[in-house]
Amino acid sequence: MGRYIGPVCRLCRREGVKLYLKGERCYSPKCAMERRPYPPGQHGQKRARRPSDYAVRLREKQKLRRIYGISERQFRNLFEEASKKKGVTGSVFLGLLESRLDNVVYRLGFAVSRRQARQLVRHGHITVNGRRVDLPSYRVRPGDEIAVAEKSRNLELIRQNLEAMKGRKVGPWLSLDVEGMKGKFLRLPDREDLALPVNEQLVIEFYSR
């Protein structure tokens, strides 16, 4: 299953919860979940039957995958890697997802969504420890410095995004220097650091069935 390239607002409606895939629009009255809080399609407003246990786990898996915007293959590979590591599988899995460069760029406020962050990375606007990295799935390590590339510092999009970050706080596992257009990945986030509308235990059960 490849990466979804259609209207992202449909994904929120399909999962029945805001996934915050479109930046500021998700916080405005224009958000599709505010205007049409039911699944897309001609039968979306009909009362749904009680879902099976499998369907509940599938929806939770899809919800988490769509939040991070990655393909099923990438998602499954990260899960399998997490399941082989020491620690609580769910927390380790979320840590791997949060360590992706596109996600860190989004968390630092260089981009308003993970989709936009992927574009910035792919187009060479981001450096890690002073070296340009154009792979969104690049694994960021604790202590790494993530910055806007020198040639990209006058891009209006990035400047506007960082201007909006003034007065805001990034997650406690990150540090941000707005004026310097750079930040640091201090550590892997703890589960309580992440305000994700997901029960990762159901995702584990889905893949462990």
Curated annotation (Swiss-Prot):
Q: Which SMART domains match?
A: Ribosomal_S4 (SM01390), S4 (SM00363)
Tell me yes or no: is GTP-binding among this UniProt entry's keywords: no
S4 RNA-binding domain residues are 99-161
GO molecular function list: metal ion binding; rRNA binding; structural constituent of ribosome
Q: How is the cofactor bound?
A: Binds 1 zinc ion per subunit. In a number of structures (e.g. 4Y4O, 5FDV) a 4Fe-4S cluster is seen in place of the zinc cofactor.
- A Pfam family cross-referenced in the UniProt record is S4
Q: What does this protein do?
A: One of the primary rRNA binding proteins, it binds directly to 16S rRNA where it helps nucleate assembly of the body and platform of the 30S subunit. Binds mRNA in the 70S ribosome, positioning it for translation.
The protein's matches in PANTHER family, at most eight in alphabetical order, are given as:
30S 40S RIBOSOMAL PROTEIN, SMALL RIBOSOMAL SUBUNIT PROTEIN US4M
**Protein name per the record:** Small ribosomal subunit protein uS4
Species, as recorded: Thermus thermophilus (strain ATCC 27634 / DSM 579 / HB8)
